[in-house]
């Protein structure tokens, strides 16, 4: 069980000759501000980031980079949501790759706006999802906020209980 799984074969050894059909990403937190837990904008941003990571040069020492990444991930995850990213966070490499990708493929304003949102979130932690949740914490809990959202989403979903609402644009 990991954050990314290879999919498409019933037996792992089959990946060697038959290949990977798709990747399953399992590490996304649900966005409570979105009725279906994730927005199309977020999915498009993740897609663009994945392409940018493929675009970037590989690290010369992958094991060392992964170890440093795990340490940095823990540091960021345990920091206050409004705390700026640590200085060792190499956001410039990512944003440069995003800019190059958008320019190389002639992607339009929508994708340029996605890159701008990523840059803005790197520079200003108040734009992150974690920071947006801060005002909703009452007595060190998000329970009241979560219940309010759940009830509102439930009520909306039952306006036409036979329809799978919210996924129409994702088909």
Label the model's feature ranges.
Residues 1-171:
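C-terminal accessory/tail domains of diverse enzymes
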